[in-house]
């Protein structure tokens, strides 16, 4: 039997995280479980317990703060906590129109849609991608060239119910392997005969982040903007009750 929900906070506290960080991390893991995404859920706490270089006292740093651009450094903090700090900063001071945020040394990042959902609920459009260890080979086989490199997009709605699309480029995620829901050999681009499309997007996202991030290691890039229109209610009407991305 895996980790139980009531064990999440005590186990995180035992790793040395402060109460605020325990709550941030636990909320993310429990939300992932509630959405059926156990690869980003409680299994990750056991994974963190195996980290030899875990520094629960590390704090992300904002190195550049301009109206349309920010750069952050994880500075040894978990990527989850870096993204939480970045999102809090955008909510506290939204961009005049649009802002690009580049995050260096930001890993692991978890379920990206979770981090940008609050931005959409606050009336902002958001797009977030992040790199990860190279685990996806090209279709047809070969050495792994890219991470699963997820992409999440959140669109606000005047009805208060944003659409949040969150897709990994892998047929499964590394988290699914950690949670025992998939085998390592299943880490290939999704799409079967059309896997070249997911692989192309994984490569594009990898290079996009790498080109903007001046540091070695894994990074994330967030675009946050004020919307000029309100397309979600119309789409929901057309959907006639069908589930849209991010719905529970």
What positions do the PLM features span?
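Acidic, glycine/proline-rich low-complexity segments that act as flexible tails and inter-domain linkers
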Residues: 6, 10-21, 25, 38-57
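Active-site cofactor/substrate anionic-group-binding motifs, chiefly glycine-
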Residues: 41-91
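Phosphate/diphosphate-binding glycine-rich loops and adjacent basic-rich segments that engage nucleotide
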Residues: 134-186
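Small-residue-enriched flexible segments
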Residues: 165, 171-213
């Amino acid at each position: 039997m895996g980790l139980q929900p009531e064990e999440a906070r005590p186990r995180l506290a035992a790793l040395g995280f402060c109460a605020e960080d325990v709550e941030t991390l636990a909320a993310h893991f429990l939300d992932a479980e509630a959405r059926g995404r156990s690869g980003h859920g409680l299994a990750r706490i056991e994974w963190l317990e195996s980290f030899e270089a875990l520094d629960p006292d590390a704090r992300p740093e904002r190195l550049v703060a301009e109206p349309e651009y920010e750069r952050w450094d994880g500075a040894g903090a978990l990527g989850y906590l870096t993204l939480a700090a970045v999102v809090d900063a955008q909510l506290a001071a939204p961009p005049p129109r649009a802002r690009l945020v580049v995050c260096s040394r930001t890993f692991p990042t978890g379920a990206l849609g979770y981090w940008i959902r609050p931005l959409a609920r606050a009336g902002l459009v958001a797009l977030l991608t992040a790199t990860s260890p190279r685990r996806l080979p090209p279709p047809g086989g070969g050495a792994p060239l890219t991470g699963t490199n997820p992409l999440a997009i959140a669109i606000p709605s005047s009805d208060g119910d944003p659409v949040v699309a969150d897709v990994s480029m892998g047929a499964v995620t590394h988290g699914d392997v950690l949670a025992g829901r998939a085998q390592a050999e299943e880490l290939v681009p999704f799409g079967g005969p059309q896997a070249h499309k997911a692989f192309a997007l994984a490569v594009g996202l990898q290079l996009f982040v790498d080109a903007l991030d001046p540091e070695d290691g894994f990074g994330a890039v967030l675009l946050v903007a004020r919307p000029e229109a309100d397309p979600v209610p119309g789409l929901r009407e057309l959907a006639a009750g069908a589930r849209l991305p991010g719905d529970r």
